[in-house]
Structure formats: structure tokens, C-alpha cells
């Protein structure tokens, strides 16, 4: 069942965490539960997830186009305590956002887009080899959407996968 956004915000406010922190921590807990149900030992295990970081300055928030970098988040799926896991995710993300990783990734993505296909394929393979999952969130529209005078009843969003990434 979906988790109401208001509940996610309440948890985040109470524990000093962002919506992303809470959601990534929940996904980590769900993945750990799934793996344990399949017989895997998750004690002390981390899962490396590729997570986008917004690099667009607030004064340009209205402009079209993407301006994001990527970071490799160590998601502590081996932490059973959900509050401890949330704090670990929060600290990991804060550290990564302030690092060189997002800006470097933005530069690599720009080079990939401007370079030949061989360069694109090589760099994409390197990125894909270093993560087991790609995770992001996209807020749902705050008002109904219409296409050709027909109201859109629902949206299906997915994260582009590459290589052997198993989760998106």
C-alpha cells in the first residue's frame, strides 16, 4: 500500500530528516526484509544505490531541463532499527551532497552526451558496475493533468536501468 506523503513529512520533521531520507530508509528496510525472506543474511550489509542530486540553483528552478549529478549512496540495509537506518541514510546523503561526486557526475554526463557512442557506452558501463540500484522520487502532480482534452487517470513512472542494475 502507498505511504501517505503527509505521514512521510511528519516522520521527517520529527526526526530532522528530508522526505528523500525517509523514503530511501524505508526502501532500504523493505529490501532487507525481502532479502531476509529469501534466506540472505543482511547483517551489516550495505547496498550501493545511484541517487540523483539536484544541482540547479533556486533562482533557476523555473527553467526547463535537467541539472543533476549522481552520487553512490551506501544504503545500510543491514540496520534493522529503522530510526538508526534513517539517521545513517541522512548522514550519508548530507556528506555526499557536499562532496565533489554530484558535480563530477554532472560533468561526466555532459561529456557522455557530447561524445561518441563508444564513450557513452563505456562510461555508462562503469557507472552501472558500481551500483546495485538506481533510486529517485518524482512528486506526483498537485492538480489533474489533461492530454488532448482527456483527463489522465494515472501515471506510471520508472527509472532508466542500465547494465545489471536490479532495482530502480
Predicted regions span which residues?
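Gly/Ser/Thr-rich phosphate-binding loops and adjoining beta-strand/alpha-helix segments
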Residues: 1-53
